[in-house]
Amino acid sequence: MSELNVIKKERTAVINPIVTCQPLGAMYAVSGIERGMPLVHGSQGCSTFVRYGFARHFREPADIAVTSLHEDAAVFGGRKNLISGLGNLAARFKPDVMGVVTTCSSEIIGDDVAGFIKTAKVEIAKKMGEEAANKIKIVQINTPSFVEHQFKGYDNAIKAIVDTLAEPKDEENGKLNIIPGIVNPGDIREIKHMLSLMGVEGILLTDTSDPFDSPLRPSKADKNPYYQKGGTPLADLQDCANSLGTISLANYANSAPASLEKKYNMPSKVSEAPIGIQNTDSFIRTVKKFTGNDVTDEILDERGIVIDAMADVASRYLFGRKVAIYGDPSITVGMARFVAELGMIPKVVCTGVKNEYFVNDLKKVAKESDEDIDALFGQDLRALDVYLKENPVDLMIGSSDGRLMAKDLGIPLYRVGYPVYDRVGYQRRPIIGYNGALNLVDGITNTILDKYYETQDWKLQQ
């Protein structure tokens, strides 16, 4: 009888963490709004660290403003910084949406962020006029960095955006809200591709595909401000209250669907990322259920191509190989199920998040695959390192942060998740959907071939 063995962290210290702080998730979410600008209410390092991480992973600049709190703010508060910061952004960039993202310092100080925003709106109206000021929406996003992680920050941001901007109307718009989670531009494009094949118009909450992978073209605007192409328009964010339903593709992003369901009686579904055959099938069925649209031959063809690719390589190269997976709780569960579909053994799955969905979903994977799985629950890469020294595997799947561990242990690493900074092009290649599954089949198999098949074996492969 297969079972899930949950291993919790015994020590207090965190060594080589898998997660980072809440504001990153909020900044990511706001960056997916067309003409949206995150304003970090904290020190300069709070924004610099995230911009640096985004630049390494996405190979794109990120426009993130900061109120630049210093030591005096710890005594006197950050009122002046936030009010002047909002005013400067409004005057110079004229954004459609400004997301005020709190941090450790502003939360510990106890700044009245809501009150400061009200004052800032009055000041902006005085300088720009009532009409211009009313066009700029300000969203307060509380993300205390000293608790939780970037996934909670993302969840808080999406809920704040929906609660602040959604405007109900008398009629449904026939659209479907999709919360993608913290994924890559290639993944979001794949989501839009699948919806398009089914004739479904989606509202992405939010769409970071173009903002983090934009074309390099001369600006059509003759003057500043210049914004990256794309993002979810403000009109769509306001219209999300009138959609047919909400699907969250990340089990940690459940607050916004619950809020929409409670306020507007809108059906919702929170699930794992649609990675692999079973999870993508589930996503397609949910879309069909909410919209009534049929599954097209094009989608079935894409599914068939993946299954054909799996049949080509699974039994020959992958069957029975043990895998260690670490990272995002939603992606790791999806990857665990997919490697099991390939005939591999998800020996250990590690996440830095204490998320009960993670444990419950992994129990299902263990039962389906009929394999025992060790779950490092709320752990770090040091715990995974210690585990793998005693329980060796054939393949590691996770972010670039595990590259040195993989090298020391002599285990090949297939890079998935955030951040990936020692390979190029990863952010453009989906791992979601059937096309994403095809990329994973090829990538995982080639990684195995690089390590375990020597030149003397090549003739046997011909």
Curated annotation (Swiss-Prot):
Biological function: This molybdenum-iron protein is part of the nitrogenase complex that catalyzes the key enzymatic reactions in nitrogen fixation.
Keywords, sorted A to Z: ATP-binding, Iron, Iron-sulfur, Metal-binding, Nitrogen fixation, Nucleotide-binding, Oxidoreductase
Self-association state and partner proteins as the record states: Tetramer of two alpha and two beta chains. Forms complex with the iron protein (nitrogenase component 2).
Annotated Pfam families: Oxidored_nitro (PF00148)
Catalytic activity: N2 + 8 reduced [2Fe-2S]-[ferredoxin] + 16 ATP + 16 H2O = H2 + 8 oxidized [2Fe-2S]-[ferredoxin] + 2 NH4(+) + 16 ADP + 16 phosphate + 6 H(+)
Lineage: superkingdom: Archaea
Residues bound to [8Fe-7S] cluster: 21, 46, 104, 145
GO MF: ATP binding; iron-sulfur cluster binding; metal ion binding; nitrogenase activity
Native species: Methanococcus maripaludis (strain DSM 14266 / JCM 13030 / NBRC 101832 / S2 / LL)
Gene Ontology biological process terms, A to Z: nitrogen fixation
Cofactor list: [8Fe-7S] cluster
Gene (name only): nifK
Protein's name in the database: Nitrogenase molybdenum-iron protein beta chain
EC number: 1.18.6.1
